Each structure stands twice: as C-alpha cells, then as structure tokens.
C-alpha cells in the first residue's frame, strides 16, 4: 500500500463522512465508489473527531459544567458530520421498530420523515453519549476526556467496515450496493488501524483497563448489531452502516466511563 494512495483515500473518506471541505483535485478521476475507502475510515474518523475534541477542551478550560460541555461537543460533532450517522440510526430504528416484515422495514427506512422510534433513538443516543462523556470528564483530566472523542470516532468507524463487509446489500438497487462492498483486506486494515488509533489515544491517559473495556465492548456491540441486522433485513443498507457507528460509539463511551 502506498502512503500517497492512503492519504488520498483518507481525504476522500473525510469528505464522505463529514462536511469538512477537501481539495477538489483529490476527486479527479474518482468514480465515487467506497469499497477501498473503507480502509481509511478509522483515520478519517480520528480527524473528524478532533473538531469536537478541541471544542470540549476549550469549554472545560472555561470551567463549563461537564454535562453542558459534553452536549455542546456532541452537537459540534453532529454539525461536522452533517448528522450522517444519526440519520442512519433514526431510519434504522423506525424501520426495525415499525416494520412487521423485512420488506416493510426497508420501505420505512427509505422514508425521509422521522417517526417515533427514530426520535426516541436520537434522544437516547445524545443523552447516553453526553452522560457517559460527562462521567469521563469528571474522572479524568480535560485533555484525556477530549482525546476520548477522536479515539471513539476512529473505533466506531472501524466497526462500519466489519458490518459492511460481513453483510450483503439488503437492496440490490440501493445506494449501499452501488458503492461497492469492501474486500476482506480493506476490512481487516480498518479494524487493525481502528484498534491501534484507539490504543494510542486511550492507553496513555486512561490506562490498560479502560482500553481493553472499550475495545471489547465496541467489538461485541458491532458484532451483535450485525447479527441482529442479518436476521431482520438479511443485509446492510446505508442506514444500518450509520447505526453501526452510533451504537458502537455509545457502547464504547459507556465502557470507558464505567472502567475509569
């Protein structure tokens, strides 16, 4: 693998996963497929996560209440990503909660309107993540708490690669199908790099126990959700990819907060 190719893939992944602007020249000749970009998702998540991390650090330096600082940082993160993953979580919750069959669930997930299940999922996602991040703030230094954001961002986007590669497209004509499916090499690279990036950011400030807890819980959450979606939808969609990220982020933040 060439470093230049990986750098280009990372920039393209950042552009796909967020609203951060990237140089247009990087997209010359690019066909828009994402199957190779998946390998760069964790590092792209790391870069995206630094924006809310800096926000959190600034707020804590002003002695902002931990819960308020956590909520603002998560709001900034949603602005940076365009709430891409939150949208997937809401649509998946609506589809699974409101659909009595696989076909009906997929139809509901395609509807852009948010339903009761989606609204509840979004509220719980923000509430649980904010509470967990506030707990991390209270039991660690401001810098350590800030570093947890890009660490979890990298780890949760590595989980997307697992979900995407292990499940076929639920709809042959869907957006996820048109983007291609990652091969095992790209998936393995994403998982290993996600774990290494998380270790670099979590181990020094928090220690070994929170790191192990975060890695284990993220892995179990991603695996369990993938099995659940296989049974419910028999394949992945763009929405379930976003939901995977959200579920793993929630689970990892809770694991870190509990292990401190």
Swiss-Prot record:
One of its GO terms (biological process) is cobalamin biosynthetic process. GO terms for molecular function: adenosylcobinamide-GDP ribazoletransferase activity; cobalamin 5'-phosphate synthase activity. Pathway: Cofactor biosynthesis; adenosylcobalamin biosynthesis; adenosylcobalamin from cob(II)yrinate a,c-diamide: step 7/7. Its EC number is 2.7.8.26. One of its GO terms (cellular component) is plasma membrane. Its main location: membrane. It is found in: Cell inner membrane. Joins adenosylcobinamide-GDP and alpha-ribazole to generate adenosylcobalamin (Ado-cobalamin). Also synthesizes adenosylcobalamin 5'-phosphate from adenosylcobinamide-GDP and alpha-ribazole 5'-phosphate. This is Adenosylcobinamide-GDP ribazoletransferase.
